[in-house]
From Swiss-Prot:
The lineage of its organism: Bacteria, Pseudomonadati, Pseudomonadota, Betaproteobacteria, Nitrosomonadales. Belongs to the complex I 30 kDa subunit family. This is NADH-quinone oxidoreductase subunit C. InterPro entries: NADH_DH_suC, NADH_quin_OxRdtase_su_C/D-like, NADH_UbQ_OxRdtase_30kDa_su, NADH_UbQ_OxRdtase_CS. It catalyses: a quinone + NADH + 5 H(+)(in) = a quinol + NAD(+) + 4 H(+)(out). It is a peripheral membrane protein. GO terms for molecular function: NADH dehydrogenase (ubiquinone) activity; NADH:ubiquinone reductase (non-electrogenic) activity; quinone binding. One of its GO terms (cellular component) is plasma membrane. Gene3D superfamilies: NADH:ubiquinone oxidoreductase, 30kDa subunit.
Length: 206
């Protein structure tokens, strides 16, 4: 969006959400608002229903693990001790505006947020994806189950502390004639052999 359109949207947001605790930043032609998890549903409904905003479409939703970050936005808000966040990308078809919402989850051990399916139905599979990959639980989701990994998958593969090789591996067992799961058997190995050259190797004789 152009700066004038972003400024207009920012003004509308400040007026409509004046009674809410909202941190706003403008970077790369887009607005981002940082809100508290307890205010998520109220603000989401306002963003959708208020005629000056009319964010009727949820374009994307994703989880983020900030455990290895020092800041949480391009503008440099301090991350504090909250590890997980959920980011929402909204579109207003009526006004042709876009908005990003970032919400940090309070509990690092059992991350949980309210589902926004009843506000934006397109959140359904996005919330399932964040649950599957990050382990973020969405309250009142009608069908919260894994969507990308298998049902017996252990852990959440997009968390920063998830091992690169995983925990289990899958292979076909010719004796049982079916696919089986077993603990990973990957071992550290040296792909390029270590070669010790003899002294004076490559030096021209005189």
């Amino acid at each position: 969006m152009t700066d004038s359109r972003v400024d207009k949207l920012a003004t509308n947001l400040q007026q409509v959400l004046s009674d809410q605790q909202v941190d706003m930043s403008h970077a790369l032609g887009e607005l981002t608002i940082l809100i508290h998890s307890r205010d998520l549903l109220g603000i989401a409904e306002t963003l959708r229903n208020h005629t000056d905003l009319a964010f009727d479409t949820l374009v994307d939703l994703c989880g983020v693990d900030y455990s290895e970050y020092t800041t949480n936005t391009h503008a440099g808000y301090k991350r504090g001790d909250k590890r997980f966040a959920v980011v929402y990308h909204l579109l207003s078809v009526k006004h042709n505006h876009r908005l990003r919402i970032r919400v940090f989850v309070d509990d690092n051990e059992f991350p949980m947020l309210d589902s926004v399916i009843h506000i934006w139905p397109s959140a359904n599979w996005y919330e399932r994806e964040a649950f599957d990959l990050f382990g973020i639980v969405f309250n009142n989701h009608p069908d919260l189950r894994r969507i990308l990994t298998d049902y017996g998958f252990i852990g959440n593969p997009f968390r920063k502390d998830f091992p690169l090789s995983g925990h289990m591996e899958m292979q076909y067992d010719p004796e049982q004639k079916r696919v089986i799961y077993q603990p990973i058997t990957i071992e550290p190995r040296e792909i390029t052999p270590y070669i010790i050259r003899e002294e004076q190797y490559g030096k021209e004789e005189t």
